[in-house]
């Protein structure tokens, strides 16, 4: 990918040069007749000495956070059997940069938010560090340091890293994301396309303060997260970086963007998303304490009702009024769903007071509760509505994950 990017940059340079030369040729042709007569009167062009105060709220905000935004470098084992095309289409997997025989697989961004003794803590996206064999963090001053993983949470796509604080100058501060306003300035700071563009800043506004965004994880499961929407330019490599307000406070951790419509027919601009700072602070505090996030689990494998064929749906004998829900594919022995009497073929339509039309709805409803809470689950069996009081005594770490269907 690095080679492809350089090629594009060079091509842009050539086109720009051609335009400049063309303009020069036109100017000369229109002034040629008087050139000889005016040579004695020509004067050289000079740079103006007038100074301009360029300090603004934006430049001040960027200055406050720039030293705390870093590049995160993910090294993985080199796959010698991979195609030569992987260097073009596989991110930085073809990079010559390596450490201890490992290959630089990808790069993202991160934010230093805390110093404690000889350590400093960095928050980034989980997908930035996924699959790593080794991690480096490139500081704003150019120093590259080793990083270790304190903890991560796939569901919220957040991770906490620990590095030496020796060269750390500043740490970022978090704003209260519950007080954000649509239309207020938003600035993204990170490393788009990798560390060669480290500490790139782009400016926009907050387009929305709360959006439900559906993410597809590497294992195929989908999750719903709450996100801030912005039109500040966010590109590959910005993941894990800072979205800041006009005071230089972090209001979100940049995470994703929409580039095309779902069917790929229309390109999209200005739809970037960040995890709100209040959610970030809640998760990183738990990751620092426990290294993981414990969430309640039902103990089922499931499939969305909408994904079943007409023939399969008819066998469930559902009333015509039931058009959405989650079909229990199997029940794991010893977990809450089994203890409450749920069986394969049941169709869950509600958890507590929250309607469930998909697996992401079920996850969102379930994860709003704590372990050992008791919730009422509404489901259909043989066409009849039933309820079960389910004690959420187990966590997601107790789940079997070998099935291709979603688990919870």
Swiss-Prot record:
Disruption phenotype: Inactivation leads to growth thermo-sensitivity and reduce the efficiency of secretion of the recombinant protein produced, although the protein produced is completely stabilized. Cells lacking this gene show an alteration of surface properties. The keyword Hydrolase applies. Keywords: Cell membrane, Hydrolase, Membrane, Protease, Serine protease, Stress response, Transmembrane, Transmembrane helix. It is a single-pass membrane protein. GO terms for cellular component: plasma membrane. InterPro entries: Chloro_Bact_Ser_Proteases (IPR051201), PDZ (IPR001478), PDZ_sf (IPR036034), Peptidase_S1_PA (IPR009003), Peptidase_S1_PA_chymotrypsin (IPR043504), Peptidase_S1C (IPR001940). It catalyses: Acts on substrates that are at least partially unfolded. The cleavage site P1 residue is normally between a pair of hydrophobic residues, such as Val-|-Val. PROSITE patterns: PDZ. SMART domains: PDZ. The active site is at 127 (charge relay system), 157 (charge relay system), 239 (charge relay system). Degrades abnormal exported proteins and responsible for the propeptide processing of a natural pro-protein and for the maturation of a native protein. It also plays a prominent role in stress (heat shock, ethanol, puromycin and NaCl) resistance during active exponential growth. This is Serine protease Do-like HtrA.
């Amino acid at each position: 990918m690095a080679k492809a990017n350089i090629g594009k940059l060079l091509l842009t340079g050539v086109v720009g040069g051609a335009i400049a030369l063309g303009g020069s040729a036109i100017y000369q042709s229109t002034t040629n007749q008087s050139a000889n007569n005016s040579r004695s009167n020509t004067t050289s062009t000079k740079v103006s000495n007038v100074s301009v105060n360029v300090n603004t709220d934006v430049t001040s905000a960027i200055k406050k956070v720039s030293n705390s935004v870093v590049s995160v470098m993910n090294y993985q084992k080199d796959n010698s059997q991979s195609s030569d095309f992987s260097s073009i289409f596989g991110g930085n997997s073809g990079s010559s940069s390596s450490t201890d025989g490992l290959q630089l697989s990808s790069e993202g961004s991160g934010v230093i938010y805390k110093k404690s003794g000889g350590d400093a803590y960095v928050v980034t996206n989980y997908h930035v560090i996924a699959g790593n064999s080794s991690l480096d963090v490139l500081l704003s001053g150019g120093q590259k340091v080793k990083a270790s993983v304190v903890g991560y949470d796939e569901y919220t796509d957040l991770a906490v890293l620990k590095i030496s604080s020796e060269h750390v100058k500043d740490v970022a501060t978090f704003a209260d994301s519950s007080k954000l306003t649509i239309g207020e300035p938003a600035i993204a700071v990170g490393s788009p396309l990798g560390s060669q563009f480290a500490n790139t800043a782009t400016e926009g506004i907050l387009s929305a303060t709360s959006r439900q965004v559906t993410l597809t994880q590497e294992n195929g499961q989908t999750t719903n997260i709450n996100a801030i929407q912005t039109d500040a330019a966010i590109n590959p490599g910005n993941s894990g970086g800072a979205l800041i307000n006009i005071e230089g406070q972090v209001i979100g951790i940049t995470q994703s963007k929409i580039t095309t419509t779902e069917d790929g027919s229309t390109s999209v601009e200005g739809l970037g998303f960040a995890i709100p700072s209040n959610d970030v602070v809640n998760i990183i505090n738990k990751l620092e304490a426990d290294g993981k996030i414990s969430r309640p689990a039902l103990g089922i494998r499931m499939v969305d009702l909408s994904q079943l064929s007409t023939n399969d749906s008819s066998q469930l004998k559902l009333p015509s009024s039931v058009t959405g829900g989650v079909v229990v594919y199997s029940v794991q022995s010893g977990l809450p769903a089994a203890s409450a009497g749920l069986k394969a073929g049941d169709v869950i339509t509600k958890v507590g007071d929250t309607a469930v039309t998909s697996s992401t709805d079920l996850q969102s409803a379930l994860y709003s509760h704590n372990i050992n809470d008791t919730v009422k689950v509404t489901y259909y069996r043989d066409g009849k509505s039933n309820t079960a009081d389910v004690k959420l005594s187990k966590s997601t770490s107790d789940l079997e994950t070998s099935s291709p269907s979603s688990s919870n």
